[in-house]
UniProtKB/Swiss-Prot annotation:
The gene is sgf11. One of its GO terms (biological process) is regulation of transcription by RNA polymerase II. GO terms for molecular function: transcription coactivator activity; zinc ion binding. A zinc finger (SGF11-type) spans 72-93. Keywords: Activator, Chromatin regulator, Metal-binding, Nucleus, Transcription, Transcription regulation, Zinc, Zinc-finger. Coiled coil: none annotated. Zn(2+) binds at residues 74, 77, 89, 93. Component of the transcription coactivator SAGA complex. SAGA acts as a general cofactor required for essentially all RNA polymerase II transcription. At the promoters, SAGA is required for transcription pre-initiation complex (PIC) recruitment. It influences RNA polymerase II transcriptional activity through different activities such as TBP interaction (via core/TAF module) and promoter selectivity, interaction with transcription activators (via Tra1/SPT module), and chromatin modification through histone acetylation (via HAT module) and deubiquitination (via DUB module). This is SAGA complex subunit Sgf11.
Length: 117
């Protein structure tokens, strides 16, 4: 059966590409699933299996949840801040963010220029 129009040809090409891609993807997933069940010939362990323990990622590393993220007390306002946000908070808390420092220095330079004239 020959497609009569450009749309028919395009649809046929797309269907063939999609079928080939889907077939290749399912074969790859099936192969990886089968290999993950076998023991590794080098170390005689299940190296390819994913960790399924709760609280761990797929590699077996502990996942930090909000309850076990370390918190530090701010030196200025004494609030508890997460370790990942501490530097940014301290910078804002002291009022020395880059934008503020730049604007203050330009204002200071402008004032000095006016006094010299």
């Amino acid at each position: 059966m020959q497609p009569a129009s450009l749309a028919g040809i395009s649809c046929t090409i797309f269907e063939n590409l999609l079928k080939d891609y889907t077939h290749e993807l399912t074969q790859t997933v099936h192969k990886n699933a089968k290999l993950s069940l076998q023991k590794c010939p080098a170390c005689n362990k299940h190296c390819r299996q994913y960790c399924t323990k709760p609280g761990y990622d797929i590699y077996g590393n502990s996942v930090q949840t909000p309850s076990n993220v370390p918190y530090y007390s701010c030196l200025m306002c004494k609030r508890e801040i997460a370790a990942s946000r501490y530097a940014a908070h301290l910078e804002k808390c002291k009022g020395r963010s880059l934008s503020n420092a730049t604007s203050y220095s330009t204002l200071f330079e402008d004032d000095n220029a006016d006094e010299e004239d």
